[in-house]
Amino acid sequence: MQTVELAMPDGGVLRLELRPDPSRPILFALGVRKSGSSLMNLILLDLAEANGCPVVLLPDVAFKAGYRYPDWNGHPELFKILRRGNLYAGFRDAPTGLFARPAFKTARKILLVRDPRDALVSEYFSSAFSHRMPERNAAGSLIEKRRGEALQQSVEEYVLAQAKQLNRTIDFYRPLLGDEELRIFKYEDVIFAKPAWIRDMADYFGWIAPDGLVDEIMAKRDLVPTEERPTEFVRKVAPGDHREKLSAQGIAKLNAMLSPTWRQLGYDLG
């Protein structure tokens, strides 16, 4: 076990526990908020444990310590966390601070994306109702602020207001889209085909996923509500929810606001 400490500007320390293995590769699991990243990370934790691969959840560790994405992503010594034999996961924003590093460039990476219109609708319900409030720190104060803002807006008002921020998130991933080491999964393709998705991710990372393991993971992770649950974390998984929650005019306006990167990923935005 190795401990890596990053001195933060506020005088604190971001501490990560790593288990390097020079004989195994570095792996990355990347995502976008409200696009199935929590489910992907849980599945990967199960797969990684079965395959003896340590998982480093950098964003989660940072969040619990009170640090947000800009705090760690821009850290000049972020590269020090990279060790062979680890899966780096938990990302809902692009770790651009690592993009130039050879260890990142050559690492196998998966990226899970979702129709941005559905992601924004999902984000509204999470912000307004289902996010568990964390400890009172800078990160927690931001979530509390977003909840207050969401509760004062309609779904449509919220998604139109937040579209620019989601564009920013996906545009930061754009430099990776031609990366030969990147495998892209679309939420719409995998949410109702989880066994195949589990096997695909395992195979890409060089892991095994026998039928018994896939069955165990499915028993734990295959949560599909029979009806919408607005205040629950797993609210509604079926694609196309934006068509039920937004007006035709709202969808047209949102389509016009969304980044070309979404079209590059294969989403038809009209």
Enumerate the predicted regions with their spans.
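The conserved 3'-phosphoadenosine-5'-phosphosulfate
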Residues: 54-72, 178-248, 252, 256
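Active-site cofactor/cluster-binding pocket
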Residues: 148
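PAPS-dependent sulfotransferase catalytic domain
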Residues: 1-145, 156-184, 257, 261-269
